Regions:
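Hydrophobic side chains in beta-strands
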Residues: 1, 35, 73-74, 105, ...
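Pocket-edge structural micro-motifs
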Residues: 34-36, 83, 105, 136, ...
Length: 205
């Protein structure tokens, strides 16, 4: 999407036990919803965010998660991807989602160093020039790509069959992977296997 034409935001679950992508898409102004960051589940099956989460300038969780190395943020300069250790004061952000790992580093450098061959469904946000690209990958049997393979796809040039991302960050994946969009008066959804804590949503300006 082009940020000049569309707004991208984060949305939190509508109930303590999570929301499906269908529920995130119910807002009439939302045209696309994609699963967001990782989350914890307590003994009562209530969901809470893993790591820093800021939505509409309000800090929902201020605690850094030591295993999530990146963050998708929007501040006065726009939307970008940074290292979690570089977040600084959370009051600087309209939204901030700690997640990771960073799959494509600055200027298209591969952010994953080795292949563990753990192939599951994946989701990511890719920044390319002035565009924001939302990527989900669903294997029919639940077997998608490893993080290394996913990063290769995102970093590769378009002429080589990739997406040519300048920066890209991994979102929650596996059973959480889900996306929905409204196209030409119809709704298209790819459901996940369970509900999620937060989602990335896109609205027309």
């Amino acid at each position: 999407v082009d940020p000049a034409l569309f707004d991208m935001d984060l949305m939190e679950q509508k109930a303590p036990h999570g929301s499906s992508i269908r529920e995130f898409l119910e807002d009439s102004s939302t045209i696309l919803a994609l699963n967001g960051g990782f989350f914890e589940i307590d003994h009562s099956k209530r969901l809470s965010p893993s790591g820093v989460l800021v939505i509409n300038g309000k800090i929902r969780n201020a605690s850094l998660h030591d295993r999530l190395s990146g963050a998708l943020v929007r501040n006065s300069e726009g939307i970008t991807i940074i290292g979690a250790k570089d977040l600084g004061p959370l009051t600087n952000y309209d939204f901030a989602l700690q997640t990771g790992p960073i799959l494509v580093e600055d200027r298209g450098k591969l952010g994953i160093r080795r292949n563990d061959y753990d192939r599951v469904n994946r989701a990511a946000v890719c920044l390319r020039d002035h565009l924001i690209i939302f990527v989900t990958l669903h294997g029919s049997d639940g077997n998608g790509l490893s993080l290394y393979e996913f990063a290769e796809l995102l970093a590769a040039r378009e002429i080589d069959g990739g997406l040519g991302c300048n920066l890209a960050i991994n979102l929650d994946g596996g059973p959480s992977t889900q996306v929905g969009m409204k196209v030409g008066g119809t709704r298209e959804e790819v459901d996940g296997l369970w509900k999620i804590h937060n989602a990335i949503v896109v609205r027309r300006k």
